[in-house]
Amino acid sequence: MAKKQNKLVKEETLETILFNCRNSLRGRAAMTDKRDLLLTLVFLKFIGERFKQQKEKIRHEIVEVQGINDTDFIELQLSRPNQYMQDGVFFLTDETFWDKLILTSPTGMAIAFDTAIKTLDDNEPKLKNALPQQIFTKTALEPGVLKSVVDEINKIDPQKFNDHDLIGRVYEYFLQAFSINADKEEGEFYTPHSIDRKSVV
């Protein structure tokens, strides 16, 4: 039985995951808040993936190419922001790194994500005034609901869904879903002007 369930999980499609995100938020927040919250989570997930990839690239360069195995030296290089920024990758601290954020207890998750957004806004010139502030506390979701949405977003694995424009597919799904159902004052053709997906692809 367990093997069968594991197989079903492995076969879960991207569209199923994204639908589950929307379904978890059904009737729980304003349409625009749900849209912004989901897009922000996707953004944090993908810059976290880029950060991990860059970290492994740096490690590979030091160990495999340069032949250096000094642990202290490796850790020092991995902690240098310029090693990431030179390739257009955001340098993330534990406070802003997806893999750390998702370990937060459900009751503290909204504050943790809002703090991450503020930190990025303060420290990354490219993201200044680009991300919605206090969106997680503003929506006031029950801790369990936010945790379930975060868990769904965490399933979006670039290694599993091998698509050169995966984040584009995810953004398009949410933007279409919420533009179709958006309030009239939002307009039918919502175009994101704040979060630039090019910064995470």
Regions found by a protein language model. Name each.
Residues 1-197:
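Non-catalytic, mostly N-terminal accessory regions of nucleic-acid modification and defense proteins
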